[in-house]
C-alpha cells in the first residue's frame, strides 16, 4: 500500500501534536460511519452517555468500544485508511486499536467537554494517535481545538465533569 501522508504532514504532526488532514477518507467511509452512528444511537452499548446539559437544546451523545457492535464500524476499523494514517503519523510499523469512540454533537449544542489530553483516559505509556473525523461540515467554533505543541509540555490535562 502506498503512503497516504507526505513528509511535511508528518513533520507538522510531530511539531504541533495535531494536524488538519483533508481528503484522506473517501466519502463512502463518511457515509458508512453516519449509518453506524444512527444505528448506535438506536441500539447503544451499556457505555453510552448522554452529555446534553439542557434537554431543550441540541444533544451531545457519546459511546465507546462499539467497533465490533455495528458492521459499519467493524468495516471501518479493518478496511479504511485509519490504521495506515495513524502508523504514518506515529512512524510506527504496528498500530493497536486501544479504543474507538464516537461523539454526536448536534449543531447549536451548548454541551461540550473541557480541555483535556486524551491520553489521560488510558493506562499505558507511549505514543498515541487520535483521529477526529467529522461526518459533516463543522464551523470552527463547533469543532475540536488543540493547543499546538502541548504534547511536548510534559504536563497532563485531565478531563473533569
What are the roles of these predicted feature ranges?
Residues 109-161:
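Catalytic core of non-heme Fe(II) oxygenases with the double-stranded beta-helix
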Amino acid at each position: 500500500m502506498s503512503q497516504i501522508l507526505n513528509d511535511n504532514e508528518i513533520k507538522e504532526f510531530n511539531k504541533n501534536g495535531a494536524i488538519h488532514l483533508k481528503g484522506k477518507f473517501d466519502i463512502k467511509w463518511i457515509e458508512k460511519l453516519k449509518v453506524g452512528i444512527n444505528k448506535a444511537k438506536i441500539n447503544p452499548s451499556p457505555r453510552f452517555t448522554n452529555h446534553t446539559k439542557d434537554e431543550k437544546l441540541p444533544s451531545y451523545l457519546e459511546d465507546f468500544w462499539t467497533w465490533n457492535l455495528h458492521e459499519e464500524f467493524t468495516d471501518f476499523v479493518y478496511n479504511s485508511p485509519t490504521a495506515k494514517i495513524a502508523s504514518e503519523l506515529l512512524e510506527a510499523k504496528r498500530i493497536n486499536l486501544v479504543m474507538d469512540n464516537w461523539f454526536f454533537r448536534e449543531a447549536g449544542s451548548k454541551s461540550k467537554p473541557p480541555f483535556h489530553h486524551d491520553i489521560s483516559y488510558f493506562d499505558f505509556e507511549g505514543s498515541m494517535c487520535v483521529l477526529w473525523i467529522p461526518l459533516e461540515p463543522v464551523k470552527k467554533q463547533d469543532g475540536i481545538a488543540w493547543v499546538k505543541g502541548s504534547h511536548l509540555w510534559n504536563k497532563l490535562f485531565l478531563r473533569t465533569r
